[in-house]
Curated annotation (Swiss-Prot):
UniProt GO BP: mRNA processing; RNA splicing; tRNA processing
Gene: matK
Family membership noted in the UniProt record: Belongs to the intron maturase 2 family. MatK subfamily.
Keyword Lyase among record annotations: no
Superkingdom field: Eukaryota
Database matches in InterPro entries: Domain_X, Maturase_MatK, Maturase_MatK_N
This protein's name: Maturase K
Chief localisation class: plastid
Compartment(s) where it occurs, according to its Swiss-Prot or TrEMBL record: Plastid, Chloroplast
Keywords: Chloroplast, mRNA processing, Plastid, RNA-binding, tRNA processing
One Pfam entry name: Intron_maturas2
Gene Ontology MF terms in the entry: RNA binding
Keyword tRNA processing part of the UniProt annotation: yes
Annotated Gene Ontology cellular component terms: chloroplast
Length: 512
């Protein structure tokens, strides 16, 4: 952060928010390739890419930008990328990475100045991702309906540019952003129905992540504004929001727009018990009210996306589910609030009678169907979930094959340790263990019986997690304490780092 402050003060761009001249500074591209500053941990497939981003390449890029960038924008040329020259892919990626660093500077400086100037206000609306787990345990069982939402991606580059205008007043940076979206990143290929927009694009994940977060923040900003206006509740989280350009003017504009466009539905949202939780592109809106209110919220979200963001929302992106009858898939868990009938015997005078009390219990299950589909794609089992061998790993050593299976099995056990129903997890672990044995048997051209007899019981202990292995050493496997701890529900806060287990359509990445 101090580096950014020094650079901005030296060039004198902090007061006027002019970011475009920073594009011609060599240190910007050095910062773009500084892995200590790059929190997104970009992994490039081309191992020699960092060697190409030398000082000479940056100087040559700066010279080309000085000489020809304006000609590329205004000249009537059939090749819009001619100014980049023969190193089109290299220079375009260098420019986009440098631009990604530049656009993050205002947000970092404003947040730092806010934290240094005053204490952080307590927020009940915006909390850490780790607060999802206590929310499920404490509040989820008391709610009735949930709105399962897939946030649509912006399909028009101009919408992202308009969103960015609220943060930066530099017109040149806005033109450059528009130029990147239209020319370099082949926007049309990103919005085809068969391909979803990957915010972690291999070309520049940091840049696309920034654009995606800007879009989601704009969506949630309007959502919470109307939420607070409709319920007549004072917002307790406005202090922790990033400062905007013309913030109050934007709020007044929203009041005018939604008073005209949504005046017929604004009065409908008066439920003070709505809970909003989001992780990446999926969000849930849970409430204790009637399904009529949830239908009104659904109608509001669809109109917001279509009229304000110009995004056509498919009907399947918003579902209304009853928590007692249906499960929702969130963070890789199938969660629902099941009704349990508890019979309590009471005695008054000499007459005994039974009182039935209905209690709600929060349950989380392993998405067994999705996991088996992913195992089938990775060739660990057939569609009927029968384990098969992994012939592509036959060239590896025995220890390497076992370690790969053990790592997959431990990741699954660690991630789904918060599940209350682990029968599906036991089945997945069984498939992986048997698939490992069959892979080794096929490699050595032996039989399963002979191979297991040679390995012994220690082979299956390798598939236990470190926590399970430690508990097994303290308590006997046959004891009640071992069974209770082994089947207990534990939320590990580091499971959010296992991103592939959240979206099961990309789960095959874990099984490679």
């Amino acid at each position: 952060m101090e580096k950014f402050q020094i650079y901005l003060e030296x060039d004198g761009f902090q007061q006027q928010n002019f970011l475009y001249p920073l594009l011609f500074r060599e240190y910007i591209y050095t910062l773009x390739h500084d892995h200590g500053l790059n929190r997104s941990a970009i992994s490039l497939e081309n191992g020699g890419y960092d060697n190409k981003s030398s000082s000479l390449s940056m100087k040559r890029l700066s010279t080309l930008l000085y000489q020809q960038i304006h000609l590329s924008i205004y000249a009537n040329d059939s090749n819009p990328n001619q100014f980049i020259g023969h190193n089109n892919n290299l220079y375009s990626q260098m420019i986009s990475e440098g631009f990604a660093v530049i656009v993050e500077i205002p947000f970092s400086l404003r947040l730092a100045s806010f934290l240094e100037g005053q204490e952080m206000a307590k927020s009940h609306n915006f909390q850490s991702i780790h607060s999802i787990f206590p929310f499920f345990e404490d509040n989820f069982s008391h709610l009735n309906y949930v709105l399962d939402v897939l946030i649509p991606h912006p399909i028009r580059p101009e919408i992202l540019v308009q969103t960015f205008r609220y943060w930066v007043k530099d017109a040149s940076s806005l033109h450059l952003l528009r130029f990147f979206l239209h020319e370099y990143f082949n926007w049309n290929s990103l919005i085809t129905p068969k391909k979803s927009i990957s915010i972690f694009s291999t070309s520049n994940p940091r840049f696309f992540l920034f654009l995606y977060n800007s879009h989601v923040y704009e969506d949630e900003f309007i959502f919470f504004f109307l939420r607070n206006q409709s319920s007549h509740l004072r917002s307790t989280s406005s202090g922790v929001l990033f400062e905007r350009i013309h913030f109050y003017g934007k709020v007044n504009y929203l009041v005018e727009v939604f008073a005209n466009d949504f005046q017929n539905i604004l009065w409908l949202f008066k439920d003070p018990f709505x809970h909003y939780v989001r992780y990446r592109g999926k969000a849930i809106l849970a409430s204790k009210d009637t399904p009529l209110l949830m239908n009104k919220w659904k109608y509001y979200l669809v109109n917001l996306w279509q009229w304000h963001f110009h995004v056509w929302s498919q009907p399947g992106r918003v579902h209304i589910n009853h928590l007692h009858k249906y499960s929702i898939n969130f963070l890789g868990y199938l969660s629902r609030g099941r009704l349990n009938t508890l019979v309590v015997r009471s005695q008054m005078l000499e007459n005994a009678f039974l009182i039935e009390n209905v209690m709600k219990k929060f349950e989380t299950a392993v998405p067994i169907i999705s996991l088996i589909e992913s195992l089938t794609k990775a060739r660990f089992c057939n569609p009927l979930x029968n384990p098969i061998s992994k012939p592509t790993w036959a060239d590896s050593s025995d220890s390497h094959i076992i370690n790969r299976f053990v790592r997959i099995c431990r990741n699954l056990s660690h991630y789904h340790s918060g599940s209350s129903k682990k029968k599906g997890l036991y089945r997945i672990k069984y498939i992986l263990r048997v698939s490992c044995v069959k892979s080794l048997v096929r490699k050595h051209k032996s039989t399963v019986r002979v191979f297991l007899k040679r390995l012994g019981s220690e082979f299956f202990r390798e598939f236990l997690t470190e926590e399970e292995h430690a508990i097994s050493l303290i308590f006997s496997r046959a004891s009640f304490t071992w069974r209770r701890l082994y089947r207990g529900r534990v939320w590990y806060l580091d499971i959010i780092c296992i991103n592939d287990l959240v979206n099961h359509d990309k789960l095959e990445i874990v099984f490679r």
